[in-house]
């Protein structure tokens, strides 16, 4: 029988209702300023900032606490070039052959295309992989539970942490992303989930004039 090991919840802090409203509003007012950026400066970012953001991502809840994620941080110029070439190859196929007209129409307001200069311009790329199973040092395979949901939550925390640090990001998902396994030498049990582009915005960076749905459109109270 497995022994359950529990410890007291000591770090929880309760706030007054008024303080909770203030804190939640402050967080919303800050996070709503976050924007997806496609034009990056090549200004360097302290590596410790990236590490701290990844530490935050690693606190995410996961199925059975198995933490089925792997983050690969890329700053090497040659590797970024390889990733760009791999991504643009898939994106060219997507825009010219694979994507249905409805999808391309939906993308038009965002001004996207198969050219991905940001993959070389930004100081950091983080390739995020999900694990369908983990492999112990002795070769034993351990099934992972809810890997996609778990990794998605971790990515959300990571994106919020990056914004909180004063940086901008872009979620990039060329399909398929198998080329990342080859370029980054990742094992078969790791599947590319997301490529996150991170850095400072270019001085002339522009973003689409888009709006988010309001609360009534996305929430039902029962």
For the regions a protein language model found, what residue spans apply to each?
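Small-aliphatic-rich amphipathic alpha-helix that forms the alpha element of a beta-alpha
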Residues: 53-58, 126, 132-183
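Glycine/small-residue-rich phosphate/adenosyl-binding loop
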Residues: 73-151
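A glycine-rich helix N-cap at a beta->alpha junction
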Residues: 92-99, 185-207
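Glycine-rich phosphate/pyrophosphate-binding beta-alpha loops
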Residues: 58-65
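C-terminal helix-cap and adjacent tail motif
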Residues: 2-23, 113, 194-222
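Short, basic and Ser/Thr-rich N-terminal targeting/leader segments
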Residues: 65-68, 120-122, 191
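N-terminal accessory segments that position/regulate proteins before the catalytic core
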Residues: 1-37, 41-47, 51, 82-85
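Glycine-rich, charged/polar anion/phosphate-binding loops
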Residues: 56-58, 109-114, 180-182, 205
């Amino acid at each position: 029988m497995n022994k359950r090991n529990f410890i007291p919840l000591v770090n929880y802090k309760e706030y007054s209702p008024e303080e909770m409203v203030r804190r939640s509003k402050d967080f919303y007012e800050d996070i709503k300023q976050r924007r997806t950026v496609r034009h990056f400066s090549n200004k360097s970012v302290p590596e410790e900032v990236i590490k701290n953001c990844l530490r935050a991502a690693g606190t995410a809840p996961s199925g059975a606490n198995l933490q089925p994620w792997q983050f690969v941080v890329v700053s090497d110029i040659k590797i970024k070039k390889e990733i760009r070439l791999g991504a643009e190859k898939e994106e060219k196929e997507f825009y010219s052959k694979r994507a249905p007209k409805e999808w391309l129409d939906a993308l038009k307001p965002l001004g996207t295309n198969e050219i991905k200069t940001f993959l070389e311009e930004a100081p950091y790329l983080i390739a995020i992989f999900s694990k369908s199973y983990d492999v112990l040092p002795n070769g034993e395979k351990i099934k992972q539970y809810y890997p996609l949901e778990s990794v998605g939550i971790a990515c959300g925390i990571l994106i919020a942490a990056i914004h909180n640090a004063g940086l901008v990001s872009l979620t990039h998902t060329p399909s398929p992303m198998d080329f990342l396994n080859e370029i980054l030498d990742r094992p078969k049990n790791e599947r590319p989930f997301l490529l996150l582009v991170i850095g400072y915005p270019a001085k002339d960076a522009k973003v689409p004039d888009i709006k988010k749905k309001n609360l009534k459109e996305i929430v039902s109270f029962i």
